[in-house]
């Protein structure tokens, strides 16, 4: 039955039960309502507790600083917690601040917030009261209905049965208790609706009867369909059995054939397996024999292992002893290396001191050389005066030649001879120290002819060819000879007391014999190993002389390159060059004899200042790097900077990449060298001192370039004007 609030309330017992069960049913209905009221009370109490906790949480949110009270601005922090605007939150704060002091304590906030919340929820509480009242009325109504059902009479039961029989409801309704209960309730409470209810039952029962008839018809049709389906299925089963039987016979036939073929195949396999078994048996016997032999070998190996372990222990002890000895030897070797290093340093210092002393001695000798040149000039003047006096005496003393007496005195020939000796000695000094004499050496490196004083014409001495020699190499040459050497015939030993005959003087004066430039005494051993290059050109003096300086890092192959170029041979294991060394090589360049003075410089850092001094007088520079050493190529720019600082860009530079024969270990590609040469306007070649590849070609290219450059300079000089002839130092 529907309750006044729209809810459907189920009855506690079904219709048709005894009337004595009515009080139990009403009690069952009252008990849940009482429990519902208690539950609502508990829910209300728990809601109040939840609100108190929520109010405390809101207070803590507002009082983030822990002051113990909240102000009006702190109330705005609840904007994210509650669906209220800032103005509404301020209104709530004003409502909670009853005393108007501008802040709220925890007690005021909790009490006021709870009161505010419950005041907002009063309408819902009133609705809950109305629901409780409705539930009470429903409870009373249900209890009364149960009492009325208990007082139903037998006549009403008979009338209900007659109605059901008239309608034929027994065939349709299985349980009439619910309909009976509704009919009795309508008859007692609202009898005017009873006829409508009976009409409703009549229509319902007639519809149910029609539905029952349709159901029976459908069941009959379904049974007929099932029978036809069963017959068809039976027919299909029979056909399938026939097919299965035929297929089974065919399968058995094929299976028999397969079985026979399989049997034959298995028999053959069995024979093969038996043969394999025999082979395996034989192999097993053979393996057993090998296993037995291996066991014997194992025992022997164990014995050998035992011996080897003992031997290994002995060797380990010997190794340990050897290692101790090796450590001692290494310590001794380190001490020897340290001593060798000290000796090397001392040797270098000694070499430096000797070199410095040589420089000082060189300066002293240069001063002596200047003095001797002045003396030579004075002697030439005296010789001219003697010539004039002799001519006058010849005219005055022609009558008294027979009575000419012999006298002793100085003869100009003595001075001339001594001057030749002095000149020879000065030239020897220049050979030792590698100092070119600008007044007596030509472009080719050979001395010019002797000139008469003041005229610039060649003297009677003629040319004095002398091959160029290289400077001292401190590493290769012993130095004590320099300290022991000296002049064999100093100026003070020139004799002036020789007597000559009358006729001898007359013969000497008009003829003016040539000056003797060869020293009267043999020379001492020159300092250093002065190796000469093979002269490939004609014995005549070269037309040009160019000074070329080799630079580059140590061990790039400069000395080996020079030896290959000059001597056409390669000497492995050469030591590094110390100081400066040079060689001379004459080439035929375009039908012209060109002498190349090749200066080999040391690549070590400590000789850098010495190397830079030779750039100033160089006609060309060759910068060499190692193709197998990238660091030597990286140092090329530094060498080019040194050359540019010393001579600028007026000197042509040849960039050589050595060790082309060692192509497998190449670290510098050819493209990098070509790029560097293009950027700095250099001549670029890759060569090999070991095989001689591009050694002559590269220097021939540089010599031709220097010759063309000098020809260009000469042509420009001729166009400007002929320069005045240089006077000799003695003129």
Curated annotation (Swiss-Prot):
Lipidated residue numbers (S-geranylgeranyl cysteine): 729
The coiled-coil regions, if any, are 201-382
Binding site residues for GTP: 554, 556-560, 571-572, 577, 603, 658-659, 661, 689
Which SUPFAM superfamilies does its entry note? EF-hand (SSF47473), P-loop containing nucleoside triphosphate hydrolases (SSF52540)
Name of the top EC class for this enzyme: hydrolase
Which positions are annotated as binding Ca(2+)?
Answer: 97, 99, 101, 103, 108
Annotated consequence of substituting residue 65 to A? Loss of calcium-binding and interaction with the dynein-dynactin complex
Give the start-end ranges of region Switch-I.
572-580
Q: Which residues form the EF-hand domain?
A: 84-119
Q: Which InterPro entries match?
A: EF-hand-dom_pair, EF_Hand_1_Ca_BS, EF_hand_dom, P-loop_NTPase, Rab, Small_GTP-bd, Small_GTPase
Q: Known consequence of changing residue 658 to I?
A: GTP/GDP-binding defective mutant with reduced GTPase activity and protein stability. Failure to localize to the microtubule organizing center and Golgi apparatus membrane, instead shows a predominant localization to the cytoplasm
Annotated spans, Switch-II: 603-619
Q: Which GO terms describe its molecular function?
A: calcium ion binding; GTP binding; GTPase activity
Stretch list, region Proline-rich domain (PRD) which mediates interaction with VAV1: 349-540
Region annotation Disordered: where it falls in the sequence? 1-45, 426-466, 494-528
Alphabetical GO biological process terms: activation of store-operated calcium channel activity; adaptive immune response; endosomal transport; positive regulation of calcium ion transport; positive regulation of JNK cascade; protein localization; response to histamine; store-operated calcium entry
Report keywords, A-Z: Adaptive immunity, Calcium, Calcium transport, Cell membrane, Coiled coil, Cytoplasm, Cytoskeleton, Golgi apparatus, GTP-binding, Hydrolase, Immunity, Ion transport, Lipoprotein, Magnesium, Membrane, Metal-binding, Nucleotide-binding, Prenylation, Repeat, Transport
Top-rank taxon: Eukaryota
**Residues the entry annotates as binding Mg(2+):** 559, 577, 600
Q: What is its EC number?
A: 3.6.5.2
Q: Which Pfam families match?
A: EF-hand_7, Ras
Family statement drawn from the similarity comment of this UniProt entry? Belongs to the EFCAB4 family.
Question: Which NCBIfam families is this protein grouped with?
Answer: small_GTP
Q: What is this protein called?
A: EF-hand calcium-binding domain-containing protein 4B
């Amino acid at each position: 039955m529907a309750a006044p609030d729209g809810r459907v309330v189920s009855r506690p017992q079904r219709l048709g039960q005894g009337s004595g069960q009515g009080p139990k049913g009403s009690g069952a209905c009252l008990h849940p309502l009482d429990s519902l009221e208690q539950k609502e009370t508990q829910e209300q109490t728990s809601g109040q507790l939840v609100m108190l906790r929520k109010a405390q949480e809101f207070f803590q949110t507002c009082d983030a600083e822990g002051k113990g009270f909240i102000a009006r601005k702190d109330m705005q922090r609840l904007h994210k917690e509650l669906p209220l605007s800032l103005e509404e939150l301020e209104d709530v704060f004003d409502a909670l601040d009853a005393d108007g002091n501008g802040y709220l304590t925890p007690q005021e906030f909790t009490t006021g917030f709870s009161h505010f919340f419950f005041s907002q929820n009063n309408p819902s509480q009133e609705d809950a009261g109305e629901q409780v009242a409705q539930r009470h009325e429903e409870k009373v109504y249900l209890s009364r209905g149960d009492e009325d059902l208990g007082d139903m009479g037998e006549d009403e039961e008979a009338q209900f049965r007659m109605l059901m029989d008239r309608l034929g409801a027994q065939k349709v309704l299985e349980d009439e208790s619910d309909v009976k209960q509704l009919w009795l309730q309508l008859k007692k409470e609202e009898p005017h609706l009873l006829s409508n209810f009976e009409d409703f039952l009549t229509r319902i029962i007639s519809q149910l009867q029609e539905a029952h008839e349709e159901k029976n018809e459908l069941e009959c049709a379904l049974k007929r369909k099932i029978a036809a389906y069963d017959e068809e299925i039976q027919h299909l089963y029979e056909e399938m059995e026939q097919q299965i039987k035929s297929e089974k016979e065919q399968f058995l036939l094929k299976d028999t054939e397969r079985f026979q073929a399989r049997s034959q195949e298995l028999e053959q396999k069995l024979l093969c397996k038996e043969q394999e078994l025999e082979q395996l048996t034989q192999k097993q016997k053979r393996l057993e024999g090998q296993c037995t032999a291996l066991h014997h070998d194992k025992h022997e190996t164990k014995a050998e292992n035992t011996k080897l372990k003992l031997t290994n222990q002995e060797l380990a002890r010997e190794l340990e002893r050897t290692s101790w000895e090796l450590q001692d030897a290494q310590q001794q070797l380190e001490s020897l290396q340290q001593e060798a290093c000290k000796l090397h340093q001392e040797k270098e210092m000694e070499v430096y001191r000797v070199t410095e002393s040589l420089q000082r001695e060189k300066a002293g000798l240069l001063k002596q050389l200047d003095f001797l040149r002045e003396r030579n000039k004075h002697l030439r003047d005296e010789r001219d005066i003697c010539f004039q006096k002799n001519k006058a005496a010849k005219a005055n003393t022609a009558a008294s030649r027979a009575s000419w007496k012999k006298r002793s005195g100085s003869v100009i020939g003595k001075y001339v001879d001594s001057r030749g000796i002095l000149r020879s000695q000065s030239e020897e000094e220049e050979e030792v120290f590698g100092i070119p004499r600008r007044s007596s050496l030509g472009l080719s490196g050979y001395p010019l002819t002797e000139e008469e004083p003041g005229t610039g014409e060649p003297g009677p001495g003629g040319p004095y060819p002398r091959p160029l020699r290289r400077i001292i190499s401190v590493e290769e040459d012993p130095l004590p000879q320099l300290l022991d050497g000296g002049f064999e015939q100093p100026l003070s030993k020139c004799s002036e007391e020789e007597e000559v005959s009358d006729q001898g003087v007359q013969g000497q004066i008009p003829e003016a014999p040539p000056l003797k430039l060869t020293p009267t005494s043999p020379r001492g051993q020159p300092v250093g190993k002065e190796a000469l290059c093979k002269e490939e050109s004609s014995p005549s003096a070269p037309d040009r002389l160019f000074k070329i300086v080799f630079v580059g890092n140590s061990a790039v192959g400069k000395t080996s390159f020079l030896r290959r170029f000059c001597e056409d041979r390669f000497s492995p294991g050469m030591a590094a060059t110390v100081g400066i060394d040079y060689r001379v090589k004459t080439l035929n360049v375009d039908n012209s004899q060109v002498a190349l003075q090749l200066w080999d410089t040391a690549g070590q850092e400590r000789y850098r200042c010495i190397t830079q001094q030779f750039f100033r007088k160089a006609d060309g520079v060759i910068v060499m790097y190692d193709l197998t050493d990238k660091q030597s190529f990286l140092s090329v720019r530094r060498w080019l900077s040194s050359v540019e600082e010393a001579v600028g860009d007026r000197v042509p530079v040849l960039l050589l990449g050595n060790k082309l024969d060692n192509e497998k270990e190449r670290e510098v590609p050819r493209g990098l060298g070509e790029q560097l040469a293009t950027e700095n306007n250099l001549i670029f070649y890759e060569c090999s001192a070991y095989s001689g590849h591009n050694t002559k070609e590269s220097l021939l290219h540089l010599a031709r370039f220097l010759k063309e450059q000098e020809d260009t300079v000469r042509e420009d000089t001729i166009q400007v004007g002929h320069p005045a002839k240089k006077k000799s130092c003695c003129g």
